[in-house]
Structure formats: structure tokens, C-alpha cells
A protein has these predicted regions:
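HotDog/MaoC-like acyl-thioester-processing domains
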Residues: 100-107, 111-158
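Residues located in well-ordered beta-strands
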Residues: 19-22, 89, 94, 109-111, ...
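Compact, glycine-rich, soluble single-domain proteins
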Residues: 49-68, 84-88
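A generic structural motif
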Residues: 24-27, 94, 114-116, 142
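Hydrophobic beta-strand-centered segment that forms part of the acyl-chain substrate-binding groove
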Residues: 68-107
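Catalytic strand-loop segment that frames the active site of acyl-thioester-processing enzymes
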Residues: 15-54
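Beta-strand-rich interaction surfaces with strong enrichment in secreted/lumenal proteins
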Residues: 8, 50, 95-99
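Short aromatic-glycine motifs in intrinsically disordered, low-complexity regions
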Residues: 2-14
Length: 158
């Protein structure tokens, strides 16, 4: 039995955009989350006609697992509020088959490579049945509340 809260307790996401089902582990530099590619899972709205998850969702699964890592650490430091993070980009993001296959329980692994103030870089992998399905390096940014407000105000005025 996991001693972690649900992913939604660490992320600012709500259904249907909350794409993770379980937090498996979080440590100083790593996190692992699970989700099943199934019509009965949180991924159901995004599956193709064959029940597969399109490969481009790999980036969001990785980003949300990074968010779980960040949210868990914030809670450990007594910071109760969930904050928004941003993906700056991804390097060498590969989903070799183009899809995350139907019926597979995905294990999303993230490992902190570098963190400097509000920037971070993570090596990420998505696996199922001991097979690596997607890999990449995801770079993130943690904006301040003021920066988020400015960004949303600019978006609302266009």
C-alpha cells in the first residue's frame, strides 16, 4: 500500500487533464508514477480508436510526474500550496512506436539532473513490462505568483 497521496494532491490539475493514477515513490532526486492505458482509466478521453494513447502524451505524463516530485517536496518543506510549473522544452524526446499501447500499465520515471533556483532538468522514461516506451529530457521553470498573474493577464487581453 502506497503511503503517498493521490497525484491530484500534488498537482494543480483537475480531470480530465490529470493524467496520473498513482504515486509509487518520491525521493530526493527521483519520482515514479503509474497510469494504465485503458478505457476505464483517466486516459480514456484521449485514447485513439485502437485504445492506444498517442505518443505525444509522453511529454505531459513526464511533466506531471515532475510536478508530483515538486509538489511532494513542497509539502515536505511545509509549503501547503500547489503551484504551477512550466515546461520550457524537451530534448531527445522519443516515443519509438508512436503510441503508448492499450492495456499497459505505464511506469513514468523522472530523475533530477540539475536544479538551479527555479529551473530544473529531468531525465525521464516511460516503461511497461520492463520495456522502455519513451524517453527524453524535460526542462522546467517555476514561475512566481506575480509572473503567473502577468502571463494570464497578457493572455486574457489578446
Amino acid at each position: 500500500m502506497s503511503h503517498y497521496l493521490s497525484p491530484g494532491d500534488y498537482l494543480p490539475h483537475d480531470a480530465p487533464m490529470l493524467l496520473l493514477e498513482e504515486v509509487v515513490s518520491v525521493a530526493d532526486e527521483t519520482a515514479i508514477c503509474h497510469v494504465t492505458v485503458s478505457a476505464n482509466s483517466v486516459l480514456a478521453p484521449f485514447l485513439d480508436p485502437d485504445g492506444n494513447l498517442p505518443g505525444w502524451f509522453a511529454l505531459e505524463l513526464m511533466a506531471q510526474t515532475i510536478g508530483v516530485w515538486s509538489g511532494w517536496h513542497r509539502q515536505q518543506q511545509g509549503q501547503a500550496s500547489i503551484t504551477l510549473g512550466m515546461v520550457l522544452g524537451a530534448r531527445d524526446l522519443v516515443c519509438a512506436t508512436g503510441v503508448l499501447p492499450a492495456g499497459k500499465k505505464l511506469s513514468i520515471h523522472v530523475k533530477l539532473l540539475m536544479q538551479d533556483a527555479r529551473f530544473g532538468s529531468f531525465e525521464c522514461a516511460i516503461q511497461a513490462d520492463n520495456e522502455t516506451l519513451a524517453t527524453g529530457r524535460v526542462n522546467t521553470f517555476q514561475p512566481t505568483s506575480e509572473e503567473i498573474n502577468t502571463l494570464f493577464q497578457q493572455g486574457a487581453s489578446t
